[in-house]
């Protein structure tokens, strides 16, 4: 197995490199909040020496309720992303939901994300691939790890091999997700960079009357377990007031705990990647 390295400017994304943080907020709530959250992430990651990519969504198109907040939309969202990029000189990742969004988003954003619920939509995959951007594929909650190869093959055949695979939990009965650590290792065998969405994996889908619940109190334990696998990156969302966040607050980290949280993740990553490779199949 060869390990694929994706180069994003001076950031190397690979399973054998120091982990990259893909972090920010769930959805753009306002320009000012996005700027302040990006500034906090950048301050902490620079202090800890962690490569960093800012994440937020301009539209949450799969909310539980039609009345739930979705975001500012693509046009306004891209303006905010451009300002964050210009102000902080930080790369960006965001998700798209329709083929027509791909080209304009790729003009501003460095990594385009394929949402888990849409990962088998061929027209969307082709449109994303044709931008030439780096692609982050969220593993659907309903697919086995080995089935990710079909999605990767679609991207490859559409002309794009700059692919990151992201674990975000698997359905376990009703209203619950679990994380299969061996499944993440299985995805690593593809050679592609694997990252762990440790906060969305805390979701309890449909856990509230009209929105998803979550288990924020277990955010540290779950992320440490994932980092022990030796991954290319960690994907998290934080908020200064999670209980009043407009989307997925029950899963969001309190922003004031970001430095302490990431210090632990970096320590685990550094330790695991200092070990020599050990093949126990022989």
Curated annotation (Swiss-Prot):
The lineage of its organism: Bacteria, Pseudomonadati, Pseudomonadota, Gammaproteobacteria, Alteromonadales. GO terms for cellular component: cytoplasm. Belongs to the KdsA family. It is found in: Cytoplasm. This is 2-dehydro-3-deoxyphosphooctonate aldolase. The gene is kdsA. InterPro entries: Aldolase_TIM (IPR013785), DAHP1/KDSA (IPR006218), KDO8P_synthase (IPR006269). It holds the Pfam family DAHP_synth_1. It comes from the Bacteria.
